[in-house]
Amino acid sequence: MTPVRDSKTMQCDGFMTIPFPAELCERMTRHIRGHIRHATGISVLENAPVEELTSAVAALSDDAFVEQFRKPLRIFPHELSGAVAEWIGSLADFLGGSRCGINYISPSEHAANPALQATSHDVFWRCVRPGKPDVGQPHADFQFWEINRGTPLDPPSPFPYDERWKIWLPLLGCDATNSLEVLQGSHREDIPLESIQTKYGTKPAIRMDWLAANEHRFFCPLPPFQNHCVLFHDKLVHRGPANATSHLRISGELTILLKL
């Protein structure tokens, strides 16, 4: 792979697709199936296809889904997130830094899920149901860090860092019509950022007229999908589109902290 600092595509576009370890993908999907089995009370198979998982989740009411699929419950277990963090640590040279890692979970998330540890890494997954409003507004990830700074949602860092990068990982039910969409080159632009109040707290947003004028620029940077992920700048505007398919969309996420 071309190192990030040498990649003209990364510098201009703000993203690139890189391989993700297949063994970690398998462990992550195995855990997700187990969570769905526990949350729904339905004995889905160990290797259940996304259609079977969709039927199980559809048995939950909207309120039950929100409760059982809260973000603190979607953080991967300590050992698994640690294995992902170990792989991320091997990418320092590729990213052009001296050290890289993943932030820990926030104090609020630890309190909400005592099965985790204060030093559990913030590697989590999302589950978007078909035809449901399970997605947020287009945003750039650095907005979350600004909004949450100094609050119980502010995640501790294992070391001082200079840059943040994001990884989005397709796991189940993801295709070119139903996956992350990015706004190419937006990390180099002056974006009219906003924040909005929701029933889940303050969330990042972007001024609606600007989004409308730039709607045509959003696109999915994948394929390939299997055992690959999107690495992107934390100021790149992106979104998870509404799920217009007949099955769940399940993906993984993490933030990379890079010391130059």
Per-range role (PLM):
Residues 237-245:
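Short beta-strand His + acidic residue motifs that chelate non-heme Fe in jelly-roll/DSBH
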Residues 147-175, 224, 255-258:
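Short, conserved beta-strand element in jelly-roll/cupin
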Residues 169, 184, 247-260:
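A short hydrophobic beta-strand segment most commonly corresponding to one strand
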